[in-house]
Design a protein with these regions (language model features):
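Conserved catalytic core of the tyrosine transesterase superfamily
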Residues: 1-150
Length: 150
């Protein structure tokens, strides 16, 4: 089986069995085609049924120089799914991406309001009725306790 046949079967699986949207299928396919292109440019002829983990690691090392860790994680995840499909359909015995870890992605701290912004927010509350008093209490609690609305 060559790469394009395997990719077509995988696309059919994603569409029919998993019910994914065309856009999702296109994104998964793009990541697999990125690997195929790299293999071709590197003169590596291995079929998807024979490719070894070391080759996948070389590819990931190559893309790590070009793209953000979040994109690397997405590509690794997509390749894991592709090779899991090949294992599930018994085209391969093992998944060469199984023990390859995605890069660690730090979590971004949430945006916070400045003291001035909080003062403006509290000043904008209409305190002439009980609902205004309630709203002020809610804002004071959220701000004072460091809570956030999600």
């Amino acid at each position: 089986m060559n790469w394009l046949d395997a990719l077509k079967y995988y696309q059919d699986y994603l569409r029919i069995e998993r019910g994914l949207s065309d856009n999702s299928i296109k994104n998964y396919s793009f990541d697999i085609k990125k690997l195929i292109k790299w293999l071709k440019n590197s003169s590596i002829i291995d079929s998807p049924l024979e490719i070894k983990r070391e080759i996948i690691q070389e590819f990931i090392y190559h893309i790590a120089k070009e793209i953000h860790p979040r994109s690397q994680s997405r590509i690794i995840s997509g390749l894991k799914g592709f090779f899991n499909y090949l294992v599930f359909e018994e085209y391969r015995a093992t998944n060469p991406v199984d023990h390859i870890e995605s890069p660690k992605i730090g979590r971004k701290l949430p945006d916070t309001l400045s003291v001035k912004e909080i003062d403006h927010l509290i000043a904008a509350i209409d305190l002439s009725n009980s609902q205004g008093e309630r709203n002020r209490a809610i804002i004071e609690i959220l701000y004072g306790c460091g809570l956030r609305v999600s």
